[in-house]
From Swiss-Prot:
The keyword Repeat does not apply. Residues 484-497 have a biased composition (Polar residues). InterPro entries: HSV_PRIM. It comes from Equine herpesvirus 1 (strain Ab4p) (EHV-1). Belongs to the herpesviridae DNA primase family. It comes from the Viruses. The record marks 652, 654 as: Essential for primase activity. The keyword Repeat does not apply. This is DNA primase.
Length: 1081
């Protein structure tokens, strides 16, 4: 093993008043100059630590010593030591761009010449230069310069210059015998052999080609034209930084540090900011503003107390340990994130939020400040403690990651984040509340024995019927929802967005009358003045009980109808599933088929699979009907009524999958899904009087695409629309906008990339052929489930899950239901059975859509199908059995899947006693990460101006619709019309005489619809600002204006439109432009 060279070395960064490259070449060629060399910074090898690591002596004023005598004494001592040890002194210049970082350590200085000061005069001159910044004369340098070591650095460059300047070429030919040379020019080989190196070689080239030599050296030494100001600004701003950072970054980062050589200059300066070792004032009395020459800069740096002594000696170790402490904290954060990446089952968006939050919690302003205080030292003796004093990791664990771990246990999650608000009622009042706030039992009874009673028609006839009904009720005190078109700016009218797609605006009908809102209001209203029930007036006969369900029916060609049904023959729709043999026998026989030895989740999943497989059905007609009354039995969507109580928890589940899922594993996953639901309900409905092991959860799966569809998808194109598994129709009724947060949360994208034509007579659910796997003794139960036939869904898989609210509870309002769905989402992803079955195939862990729980939103019922643009019927929702572990009657449980009372939001409760009504789940059941982001934003971010404060400054009350609308008409509309005239000149004329109507008022956002003024027969729509449409689609777009405050505290107005055309997103709200409002006008 080679021994380390004990020869001591010193490296000096030098500068001159003139061109440093020219001066250096003069020295290398043996020419003496009248100028001297200034030392800007220097470094020494470890063999000289005892020499330069001693603290310089301060003058003893009591003994009459001055700075000059102290300087002489220190210089003499240093000169003696240098003369004794004779270190090799390399004089260096900058090499490469200063300040950047690199993946690998790179030398930042390059030596120009090497000296050994072997005389007392030379050693003392060097000592005065290093300790006091005196210039070193060229004569002294020439006497001490060692040519062998110096020109060993430059001989290669000298040869390269000789070859290029003499214009020589390499020989041609592969062998020596075939070698050919250009007779007019010499060869490279001859030039290398014949040209001398060393001082004579450099002098020869320099004399004949001075400019080329200067250019080559300047490029090699990075065009070194630095100035004192450059050094002060680059390495400053203080004495400590300019002395210590210059030395460490240029010299010590490569020689002493293990990892410091890869950090940039700013990082080095940041390290030194926490290196608070005190030092005496600079003896020169100068500051950085005085450093206008290299002479002053050299004196300032060399006489600084940071240039030598324990402070200078300990810096490399401090930087190493400081880097170690920083990296340990950052690595801990990465370790936590890596661990949570596998265990934290949240949506992709939430996981991204989690990563940002984790970094914010670890590296926010306070955390970093505390960490920097912990790693700051004032005594070099305290360096070793900095790796253990930081609380950055410990504080992050306690304040953030411990809270994240709570999210991984549903019981802790609910205990910390959920605080249900329960209203306790006497049994008599509770029963009356349930009777008034849920559907009449006859509307969801399988067979009432009487003819169906209800109304069902398309939008235009329904609107006319509603006008007549409300006009009839107006004399009894009914408040009409129709608004006179002569008052478009009224604040009492119904919100827009209600016109059905495919139905043109009829003359005389205000576009502000929401069909679903009016129907929901009539269907759920009590008798007017205690006499006339609005539902009776709607049906035209007495004795009609209420409330009644309101449905939306999808028709071909994107049309739709609406229905209110008081009683119906549900058996014509739900009793289409034939069950050969008894369900119980089929269920219990599943063990024998599989050969399972014990009852566990795998065996129960297998029996669920057998029961689902034995259920066959009859598909609907091949094409949808244009007759609304007939189509109602093919497609039916319940419209959510926020004024009624909720008796069934209905979940719209859409799984995004990476590949096909074996049906056995899917049944196993749904058992885990059920377990998550039951766990949530048992914790929230703590007073429920039920047996949770036998409590029903009804699952319905969207039918798989048939074989014909897969053939079309793989081969020829089809004119049929994409097959959709889960997300419901994009019908946007007026009332959805009453909950803007729910609107944002709702997704509209297609679910399956399949095209479909149901022409076979076989139920789509039966398209998944689930023959039992061959018995193989070596396979585990889980492997047997994994070997079952796969579901035909390849990208998306839709489910509808319904769970009766356990007695004696009811839910009141959409907020409680939306919160419960979000908690169930959290509980399901924490269920081990579910995650182990589905984790590898799920694209996202956000699969329960909570946007459907808004007034006026519709959700398709089980046993009904979807309707394509061309009238084809597909995607029916059919039972997917998940039998409770302790089910008392399997046949009854299977039959209950067809009971409409189990899959309507507002069906009459099956239990007679209601004593608890949950109005809100309270607490912070929203995502922990969302809550954390909101709190951090409030605590850290600058307080932004609110919309209320901006309007108040204009003497407008945000609580007064009339005042806000007047402000918009007087101030905002003028700027909007001016902008339209500039950028949309063809459509701007439509906005010359318009008014506004308030739709939604939020604390930070107000949405208004722009209405045309004029008579009732004038079209209320506007031209689309995004695209040109055919004549039939012109003038049907609705325009909205919203005002809000931006992040800079400015009042902004946005124009949005909703166009019914397909190319514009089928009724999708789209922002056209946003502008700043000049309130000074």
């Amino acid at each position: 093993m080679a021994q380390r060279n004990p020869e001591p070395t010193i490296r000096v960064l030098y500068a001159t008043d003139s061109c440093v490259i020219t001066y250096s070449l003069m020295l290398l060629t043996g020419q003496e100059s009248s100028e001297g060399v200034y030392a800007i910074s220097y470094d020494w090898s470890s063999e000289l630590d005892d020499l330069f690591g001693r603290q310089p002596r301060a003058p003893n004023t009591d003994a009459g010593d001055g700075w000059s005598s102290t300087e002489q004494s220190d210089a003499d001592q240093l000169a003696t030591a240098l003369l004794q040890r004779k270190p090799s002194v390399s004089f260096c210049l900058l090499s490469g761009m200063v300040g950047g970082a690199s993946d690998e350590p790179q030398d930042r200085v390059r030596p120009m010449f090497v000296c050994v000061f072997s005389t007392w005069t030379g050693a003392r001159a060097l000592a005065m230069t290093l300790s006091h910044g005196h210039p070193l004369s060229s004569n002294t340098l020439l006497q001490a310069l060692t040519e062998e070591a110096t020109f060993l650095l430059h001989n290669d460059l000298i040869l390269a210059l000789a070859i290029t300047t003499e214009n020589v070429t390499a020989r041609s030919g592969r062998t020596a015998a075939a070698a050919k040379y250009d007779p007019q020019r010499g060869s490279v080989k001859a030039a290398v052999i014949g040209h001398s190196t060393g001082r004579s070689g450099l002098t020869s080239v320099y004399i004949h080609h001075e400019n080329k030599v200067l250019t080559a050296f300047r490029r090699l030494y990075c065009n070194n034209n630095t100035t004192p100001f450059w050094f002060a600004s680059k390495f400053g701003p203080g004495e400590r930084e300019i002395v210590l950072a210059t030395r460490y970054y240029l010299f010590q980062a490569i020689r002493c540090s293990r990892s410091g050589g890869t950090y940039d200059l700013q990082a080095v300066k940041d390290f030194i900011r926490t290196y608070n070792v005190p030092a005496a004032p600079n003896p020169t009395g100068l500051d950085l503003t005085h450093l206008t020459s290299f002479s002053l800069l050299s004196k300032f740096c060399c006489q600084s107390w940071y240039s030598r002594g324990p402070c200078a000696l300990a810096l490399p170790r401090y930087v190493d340990l400081r880097i170690q402490a920083d990296v340990a904290e950052v690595s801990a954060l990465e370790g936590f994130i890596a661990a949570d990446r596998q265990g934290l089952r949240v949506s992709d968006r939430e996981f991204i939020t989690y990563i940002y939050l984790a970094h914010f919690e670890s590296f926010n302003r306070k955390q970093l400040y505390d960490h920097l205080l912990a790693v700051s030292i004032a005594d070099p003796g305290d360096i070793d403690r900095i790796t253990s004093t930081s609380s950055l990791k410990r504080g992050t664990i306690e304040k953030f990651f411990a809270q994240v771990r709570i999210q991984l246990n549903i019981r802790d999650y609910i205990a910390h984040n959920v605080n249900p608000r329960v209203v306790c009622l006497p049994a008599s009042i509770g029963s009356q509340y349930a009777q008034d706030k849920t559907y009449t039992p006859s509307s969801t009874t399988m067979s009432t024995g009487s003819a169906p009673l209800g109304v069902c028609d398309t939008s235009t006839p329904i609107l006319k019927l509603l006008d007549r009904v409300e006009s009839s009720l107006a004399g009894r005190g009914w408040i009409q929802t129709i608004v006179s078109p002569n008052k478009p700016q009224s604040v009492h009218s119904t919100p827009p967005l209600d016109q059905s797609r495919g139905d043109e605006l009829s003359p005389g009908v205000s576009s502000q009358c929401g069909i679903s809102r009016r129907l929901l209001h009539i269907a759920s209203s009590p008798p007017v003045n205690g006499r006339a029930l609005p539902l009776e007036v709607l049906f035209g006969q007495k004795g009609v009980p209420g409330p009644a369900p309101v449905y939306r029916v999808a028709l071909p060609s994107k049309r739709q109808a609406f229905a209110v049904i008081a009683n119906d023959r549900w058996e014509t729709t739900t009793q289409n599933l034939a069950r050969p043999g008894g369900s119980k026998q089929a269920y219990e026989g599943g063990f024998a088929l599989a050969g399972f030895g014990e009852i566990d989740d795998c065996s129960l999943a297998w029996r669920d699979l057998q029961l689902t497989r034995t259920t066959s059905g009859v598909c609907r007609t091949a094409l949808a009907s244009s007759n609304a009354s007939a189509q109602m039995y093919i497609n039916r969507n319940e419209i959510f009524n926020s004024s009624l109580a909720v008796s069934n928890i209905i979940l719209d589940v859409d799984f995004g999958i990476k590949r096909r899922v074996p049906l056995g594993m899917l049944h196993l996953a749904m058992r885990g899904f059920r377990a998550g639901i039951i766990t949530t309900l048992s914790l929230i409905f703590s007073d429920a009087t039920v047996q949770w092991d036998s409590y029903p959860c009804y699952f319905y799966k969207t039918s798989c695409p048939p074989q014909l569809v897969r053939a079309l998808h793989r081969g020829e194109p089809s004119s049929f629309p994409d097959y959709v598994d889960g997300v419901e129709e994009c019908y946007m009724e007026s009332d959805f906008i009453d909950d803007y947060a729910a609107m944002e949360e709702y997704t509209d994208g297609p679910m399956d990339d399949y095209e479909m034509m149901m022409v076979d007579n076989e139920c789509p659910q039966a398209a998944c052929d689930n023959t039992p796997p061959n018995k193989e003794g070596g396979k585990t139960p889980l492997q047997r489930l994994d070997d079952t036939d796969a579901c035909e869904c390849t990208e998306k898989m839709g489910f509808r899950v319904t769970v009766p609210v356990p007695p004696p509870y009811l839910l009141a309002g959409p907020e409680a239901l939306r919160g419960l769905a979000r908690i169930i989402q959290q509980a399901v992803v924490l269920e081990r059975t579910f995650t182990e079955s589905m984790c590898s195939v799920l694209r996202d862990f956000s699969f329960i859509d909570t946007g459907v729980y808004s007034h006026g939103r519709s959700l398709r019922l089980p046993f009904f199908c979807k309707v394509g643009d061309s009238g084809e019927v597909y995607g029916g929702l059919y039972p997917f059995y998940v039998i409770p572990p302790k089910c008392n009657d399997v046949d009854e449980f299977v039959a209950q899947h067809s009971n409409p009372a189990n899959f309507h939001f507002h069906a009459a409760p099956r239990h007679p006693t209601i004593t608890h009504v949950i109005t809100d789940l309270g607490g912070d059941y929203v995502s922990f990460f969302e809550r954390k982001v909101a709190r951090n934003r409030e605590a850290i971010m600058t307080k932004r101006a609110t919309l209320e404060s901006l309007l108040s400054s204009a003497n407008v009350s945000i609580k007064s619709h009339e005042a806000v609308e007047a402000f918009v008409v007087d101030v905002v509309l003028g700027e909007v019309v001016s902008h339209l005239a500039t950028h949309f000149p063809d459509q701007s004329g439509e906005y010359q005489t318009v008014g506004v109507h308030t739709v939604v008022t939020k604390p930070d956002w107000i949405l208004m619809q722009i209405n045309r003024s004029g008579n009732a027969y004038r079209s209320q729509g506007f031209s689309c600002l995004r695209a040109k449409h055919l004549r039939s689609a012109r003038g049907l777009a609705r325009t909205f204006l919203s005002i809000s405050a931006d992040v800079h505290g400015r009042l902004c107005a946005s124009i949005s439109q909703q166009c019914f055309a397909t190319k514009c997103g089928n009724n999708k709200m789209c922002t056209i432009f946003t502008l700043e409002v000049d309130r000074a006008k």
